[in-house]
Amino acid sequence: MRKSNVILVALGFSVSSAVMAQQQRLPSDVYEVYVADKERIEREYKADKERCNSLDGNAEDICEAEAKGREEVAKAELEDKYRPSRESRYEVRMARAKADYRVAKERCDDLSGNVKDVCLEEAKAAQAAAIADAKKED
């Protein structure tokens, strides 16, 4: 009797593992759209980066931070679109918070002295608030 129970349990695990593995994969047509969307995001990032190269100084840094932020948020949104979950929604919110902070920090670089320090503190506070909001949602 024990041997048959062990066999049934092992069979149950293998079937549930196969079902879970099947759920993790995207159908081929959906996967092709996913890959195309991912490639589009990468092309847009490269084009944005090329536009940034025409700028100088901190304007270029701000432009690059904005481009990188758009790319990271778009990739996180893509993952959430094709594999929706609490974790993927959290990753979208975190990507937005990080992107906003990166841009705000670059904008503060144009300033100097106490004004720059205040700007950086405000950027950090905004990021902390965005992260806290991301953690409490869902």
Residue ranges and their predicted role:
Residues 1-7:
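Bacterial N-terminal signal peptides that target proteins for export
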Residues 18-138:
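Mitochondrial intermembrane space
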